UniProtKB/Swiss-Prot annotation:
MF terms (GO), sorted A to Z: aspartic-type endopeptidase activity; nucleic acid binding; structural constituent of virion; zinc ion binding
Record protein name field: Gag polyprotein
Protein's gene: gag
Site positions per UniProt: Involved in capsid protein dimerization upon acidification: D418, D430
Motif LYPX(n)L motif boundaries: 180-184
Motif Nuclear export signal, chain ranges: 219-229
Pfam families xrefs: Gag_p24, Retro_M, RVP, zf-CCHC
Domain notes: Capsid protein p27: Proton-driven dimerization of the C-terminus facilitates capsid assembly.
First-tier enzyme category under EC: hydrolase
Biological process (GO), any one: viral procapsid maturation
Length: 701
């Protein structure tokens, strides 16, 4: 069918111009005609006897179904076939009158001259109409009756009626050919009957003024030739090899496609899905060894190209081994010709080295397919070796990283690993449960057991986050609403104790502990060198807080007086004050990462909490709600922290804790090592010891 489509398409382009149908439309029309039984084979379309039934059938189909696409295509094809037929008849007539011989139009016999082929009408009852049936059935030719004469004089004797010139010579028997060349349909029928002259025998040329026939053409049995070619199989030629009139010819690859692929490799890398898609698209059709090696030399660097050459050679050796075991392997040409070898597959055989035209002419279709498939597989192996993926076991979700970004990094690393495809989904789901943030882990643990794929887990987490977003801003808002009553209580107490001009609130003095003035205004202020100076920690005389020997043991106690005074009254100002102001109530809340540096085995080495920056607190206090239960704590000499509501029981971390503050942009401040206090408080507090160690101020937040 491909040959018929090409012939019809060429004729349509010649006689229809820009309105010629495409090969796809012609192929669809031929398939429909064969399906409807109007054509036994695509070559029957050349026969004029099948044109009228096709026109009638397609017209009826267009009226019933309302689809005129095939009818329009047939109209263009029919016009091209008629134009080609008329041009061929005219050419054959000219050859005859010039004495060149050959052609469809037979020379006039001694009896009469027939009408031109375009003026004859063929009746179903006449013997001439049987030529189509005889051609399709390929029956032996039979003698036909003398064709009807017309009302003109004979060419030889000039007699109008009753010419006996037909007995002057014996024409050869009629030729019954196939439908491959419609111009031969009727040759032999027009030459009359009788005679034993063999078919194809050369006839003597008739001299002017003498009776006799012009020599007929030397006919070739094209039907038998076509059958022999069909039995050997049509040649399969792969892109970029194209078929021209002189045979297969090599055409180079599109430079723009190669340039775009090289840019993709440089920007995206070899393992990128975009790169693999472009390589597979470019190598979707078989390529020559010349094109394959040049393509890889352009898109790969020197080292990856050397790796690719070795991998390609290994793949070609596998093909050769399979072809050696099976003589009818496609690379061996289905058993025709010599067996393939490594030199042929690499384009190094005689006549192929540096000669793409020679490779296109000498390589078999099966060899081209094997060459391209081996090159593509070698490219995949080089991509895995040259750009190995990061270890998926080391990927964890960052403090400020979204779950989608974490899932992207994890899935990309797992798919680029050497894990079998069946094990990738369970590994990804297990990493979601162990490597994500604690709040995400809680969501995944609470997920239904019916979620068995990574996509279902991701969708579930995103849906839950839309309902209850677990972000730093949400946690900060929750913390601020929880401690807002405490802040209001402190503000109200300060308002009740206002004195002095302008209603300025007077706080407790850090020197003497009395309300109503500041430390700078304290009348009991002593100079640093005075031996009568009172210690703010132990309330002793003769030294200050920096020189106090009980400084380490008294951390967490109120500086100054009151060690033996018991719990603080509620009406007095607490030592652990809340620095949160009403205008900026969410600013002192920060995200903190705590890491246990001890050797004690724990379930989690690091936890994320939200803490309040409090410049009025002496020490850092971690709430028992935030403190992991398996992190060890010890009792202290001073087991209480004095604050709002009196004393609060306190314990201290046995191991040193590394504390890091996470900024709003996700970066970490310089970590600090300390032994924080653990108490039953509403929220964790970062005191002055932490702020001084980190170099933070509330005004910097």
């Amino acid at each position: 069918m491909e040959a018929v489509i090409k012939v019809i398409s060429s004729a349509c382009k010649t006689y229809c111009g820009k309105t010629s149908p495409s090969k796809k439309e012609i192929g669809a029309m031929l398939s429909l005609l064969q399906k409807e039984g109007l054509l036994m084979s695509p070559s029957d379309l050349y026969s004029p006897g099948s044109w009228d039934p096709i026109t009638a059938a397609l017209s009826q189909r267009a009226m019933v179904l309302g689809k005129s696409g095939e009818l329009k295509t047939w109209g263009l094809v029919l016009g091209a076939l008629k134009a080609a037929r008329e041009e061929q008849v005219t050419s054959e007539q000219a050859k005859f009158w010039l004495g060149l011989g050959g052609g469809r139009v037979s020379p006039p016999g001694p009896e009469c001259i027939e009408k031109p082929a375009t003026e004859r009408r063929i009746d179903k009852g006449e013997e001439v109409g049987e030529t189509t049936v005889q051609r399709d059935a390929k029956m032996a030719p039979e003698e036909t009756a003398t064709p009807k004469t017309v009302g003109t004089s004979c060419y030889h004797c000039g007699t109008a009626i009753g010419c006996n010139c037909a007995t002057a010579s014996a024409p050869p028997p009629p030729y019954v050919g196939s439908g491959l060349y419609p111009s031969l349909a009727g040759v032999g029928e027009q030459q009359g009957q009788g005679g034993d002259t063999p078919r194809g025998a050369e006839q003597p040329r008739a001299e002017p003024g003498h009776a006799g026939l012009a020599p007929g053409p030397a006919l070739t049995d094209w039907a038998r030739i076509r059958e022999e070619l069909a039995s050997t199989g049509p040649p399969v030629v792969a892109m970029p090899v194209v078929i021209k009139t002189e045979g297969p010819a090599w055409t180079p690859l599109e430079p723009k496609l190669i340039t775009r692929l090289a840019d993709t490799v440089r920007t995206k890398g070899l393992r990128s899905p975009i790169t693999m898609a472009e390589v597979e698209a470019l190598m979707s059709s078989p390529l020559l060894p010349h094109d394959v090696t040049n393509l890889m030399r352009v898109i790969l660097g020197p080292a990856p190209y050397a790796l690719w050459m070795d991998a390609w050679g290994v793949q070609l050796q596998t093909v050769i081994a399979a072809a050696t075991r099976d003589p009818r392997h496609p690379a061996n040409g289905q058993g025709r010709g010599e067996r393939t070898n490594l030199d042929r597959l690499k384009g190094l055989a005689d006549g192929m080295v540096g000669n793409p035209q020679g490779q296109a002419a000498l390589l078999r279709p099966g060899e081209l397919v094997a060459i391209t498939a081996s090159a593509l597989q070698a490219f995949r192996e080089v991509a895995r070796l040259a750009e190995p993926a990061g270890p998926w076991a080391d990927i964890t979700q960052g403090p400020s990283e979204s779950f989608v970004d974490f899932a992207n990094r994890l899935i990309k690393a797992v798919e680029g690993s050497d894990l079998p495809p069946s094990a990738r989904a369970p590994v990804i789901i297990d990493c979601f449960r162990q490597k994500s943030q604690p709040d995400i882990q809680q969501l995944i643990r609470a997920a239904p057991s019916t979620l068995t794929t990574p996509g279902e887990i991701i969708k579930y987490v995103l849906d839950r986050q839309k309902i209850a977003p677990l972000t730093d801003q949400g946690i900060a808002a929750a913390m601020s609403s929880a401690i807002q009553p405490l802040v209001m209580a402190v503000v109200n107490r300060e308002r009740d104790g206002q004195t002095g001009s302008g209603g300025r609130a007077r706080r407790l003095c850090y020197t003497c502990g009395s309300p109503g003035h500041y430390q700078a205004q304290c009348p009991k202020k002593r100079k640093s060198g005075n031996s009568r100076e009172r210690c703010q920690l132990c309330d002793g005389m003769g030294h200050n807080a920096k020189q106090c020997r009980r400084r380490d043991s008294n951390q967490g106690q109120r500086p100054g007086r009151g060690l033996s005074s018991g719990p603080w009254p509620v009406s007095e100002q607490p030592a652990v004050s809340l620095a949160m102001t009403m205008e900026h109530k969410d600013r002192p809340l920060v995200r903190v990462i705590l890491t246990n540096t001890g050797s004690h085995p724990v379930k989690q080495r690091s936890v994320y909490i939200t803490a309040l920056l409090d410049s009025g607190a002496d020490i850092t206090i971690i709430s028992e709600e935030d403190w992991p239960t398996d992190w060890p704590v010890v009792d202290t000499a001073n087991p209480q922290i004095h604050g709002i509501g009196g004393g609060i029981p306190m314990r201290k971390s046995r191991d040193m804790i590394e504390l890091g503050v996470i900024n709003r942009d996700g970066s970490l401040e310089r970590p600090l090592l300390l032994f924080p206090a653990v108490a039953m408080v509403r929220g964790s507090i970062l005191g002055r010891d932490c702020l001084q160690g980190l170099g933070l101020r509330l005004t910097n937040l």
